[in-house]
Amino acid sequence: MSINIKRNQLKRVVIVGGGLGGLRLAEDLCNANLQVVLIDKNNFHQFPPLIYQIASAGIDPSSISFPFRQIFRKRKNFYFRMAEARAVFPDKKILQTSIGKIEYDYLVFAAGTTTNFYGNANIEKWAIPMKTVSEAMGLRNAVLSNLERALTCATEEERQEL
């Protein structure tokens, strides 16, 4: 595989991560005279402040998920690649990704966060994180499934166990 982005005379900024920070930076830099390359493991942006509404069935997942290529479709010097960052070689100004290497003039990491369980194995085992649409959908499905099962319980004790 190859990144397959031709180098031109513009300075190249590679942004790893298309969350709120990476997306905003890419939008701002597209207005400058730069070649902007956004790398993300997904080909869409998820708007994190509304993920809880997916879990509570308040909105549809498509309401907060936006394809990067659609967001930047009118930008000439913008490129998106769905990949994961693997290694950085700062002396050579190269980023190794899951689909190949890319040279950069400037490299920005805006890779976001992960759920912190604070070293508590029980929380890690039993808690349901909610940082992505798929995690929110998992929580939503678990709650709805338990509500459906509660309707068929023979006793109040069974219902309480759910």
What residues fall within each predicted segment?
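Beta1-alpha1 glycine-rich phosphate/pyrophosphate-binding loop at the start
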Residues: S2-Y79, Q160-L162
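FAD-binding core/adjacent interface of flavoenzyme oxidoreductases
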Residues: M1-L10, F78-L162
